[in-house]
Design a protein with these regions (language model features):
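Conserved functional micro-motifs across diverse proteins
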Residues: 2, 6, 15-16, 22-28, ...
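Short, solvent-exposed recognition patches
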Residues: 25-120, 276-278, 303
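Extracytoplasmic/secretory soluble proteins
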Residues: 58-61, 69-73, 116-119, 125, ...
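Glycine-centered tight beta-turn/hairpin loop motif at sheet-sheet or coil-to-beta transitions
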Residues: 63-68, 114, 127-129, 216-220, ...
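A short local loop/turn or secondary-structure capping micro-motif enriched for an aromatic residue
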Residues: 77-84, 113-115, 139-144, 233-234, ...
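Surface-exposed flexible segments
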Residues: 83-90, 142-153, 304-305
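Short, well-structured beta-strand
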Residues: 110-158, 283
Length: 415
């Protein structure tokens, strides 16, 4: 029944494509069963130096969590047949047979060759009622990508899973296209509505943790940003806690390397691609923040979650405007892309952690009247230092004014 299913790939303009799966009449009548087997995936060919880091990721270990292959199965339902999925910024595409499966290869335009996922292969596996979606990094050549896909072993095992509620091919692809349009995000606010604290100010904070019996706890404590230090190296950090990509961003003289900013004019993805209109080098700086949390409540808080997030804000005419450094448009360009490690948002480095929860950013215990001092750090572009604010509410918001930020405020750490 495999060859009853086929892909259609149609070009639109220079860089647009329409993709759909179709099938013979018999296949069109096939009803998706209530249960289908789980799928086991392996490969008879793995590029030299690559290894499986879990059952769905094949990567070069030295590239960390970027690039390589990422595999994802979705259901193939008869409603998926004939559904057209539009795609843009495609610079190479072909329909072909991969081993015993019909499939499509797509390569996308990517401004930075830096761990980007810039290729995809879709395979239809009708005997298992699945489509396999393979996302492939720019550290893999087209030939290697095709060779891996041709040598995949895709088999159902004895565990059955219910099909109700599982993602389907067209549902997944169409939701991917609409995801970005729905969210209402607040990025501008009247400055009277935004509480702002200075370095050295003490303010209240709601935190979550557990009591000594292991039960969920919400308490109000106080927080204070004691100091902010700016550095062009990583000497302030605990060497054991330095993220690998930061360590790799140090140049020969021990300083943070510069960041190449590419100013990009957007194409429409069909007749034109994004293009770099100018580039410049900027310095990257370490932002090292010391914060003290004090428990004023009458109860010990165990496994207290803490989280710092960095925002970039500008003020004008009584309005505070949040901007995302990469999303700034200007004269002749629509956004900025870069190769360095500079990044606002959630803290990347933090000095206190415990083996608990997701990410370990917990204070294991803070008794009534006790204070805990800790450090958080980011690397940012020097040009953003004059606009930095810190969110320690614990919600991690950095790309919008969340209700916690509007209630509990931000700390002005501009330099």
């Amino acid at each position: 029944g495999v060859n009853l299913y086929h892909w259609f790939l149609e070009k639109q303009g220079s860089y647009g494509v329409s993709v759909k799966i179709d099938a013979g009449d018999a296949a069109k009548k096939t009803v998706l069963p209530d249960e289908v087997p789980e799928v086991d995936l392996s490969a008879k060919y793995v590029p030299e130096g690559m290894s499986w880091i879990d059952e769905y990721h094949l990567q070069y270990p030295e590239h960390g969590m970027t690039g390589g292959f990422s595999f994802s199965f979705v259901l193939l339902d008869k409603n998926d047949l004939g559904q057209v999925v539009q795609d843009q910024n495609v610079i190479d595409s072909e329909e072909r047979t991969f081993g015993k499966y019909q499939g499509i290869y797509l390569k996308y335009n990517s401004i930075t060759e830096n761990g980007a996922i810039n290729q995809r292969i879709y395979l239809v596996c009708p005997d298992l009622y699945r489509v396999l979606m393979i996302y492939i990094g720019d550290d893999v050549s087209k030939d290697e990508a095709i060779k891996v896909a041709e040598n995949l072993v895709i088999e159902g095992n004895t565990t059955m899973v219910k099909t109700a509620g599982l993602p389907t091919w067209s549902g997944e692809m169409i939701s991917e296209k609409t995801e970005d349009d729905n969210a209402e995000i607040s990025t501008s606010v009247n400055e009277k509505k935004l509480p702002i604290y200075q370095i050295g100010d003490t303010f209240d904070l709601d935190v979550i943790g557990e009591n000594t019996n292991g039960e969920y706890l919400e308490k109000t404590i106080s927080a204070k940003v004691d100091s902010v230090q700016i550095s062009d190296d990583l000497q302030l950090l605990d060497p054991d806690k330095i993220p690998q990509e930061w360590a790799e961003a140090i140049d020969a003289d021990g300083k943070l390397s510069t960041n190449t900013l590419n100013y990009v004019k957007s194409g429409d993805g069909i007749d034109s691609l994004d293009e770099i209109v100018k580039s410049e080098e900027v310095n990257q700086k370490l932002v090292y923040v010391t914060v003290t949390y004090t428990n004023h409540s009458n109860e010990e808080i165990d496994h207290m979650l803490y989280l710092g997030a960095l925002l970039t804000l500008t003020k004008e005419n009584g309005k505070v405007q949040l901007y995302i450094p990469t999303e700034q448009a200007g004269d002749g360009y629509d956004y900025i892309s870069w190769t360095g490690v500079a990044k606002t948002g959630e803290m990347v480095y933090y000095s206190v952690s415990e083996n608990y929860g997701n990410g370990g950013n917990y204070i294991s215990s803070i008794k009534p009247g006790e204070s805990v001092q800790l450090n958080m750090a980011w690397i940012v572009n020097e040009s953003d230092l004059k606009n930095l604010y810190l969110n320690v509410t614990g919600d991690g918001a950095s790309y919008e004014f969340s209700e916690y930020i509007l209630k509990k405020g931000l700390v002005d750490i501009r330099k």
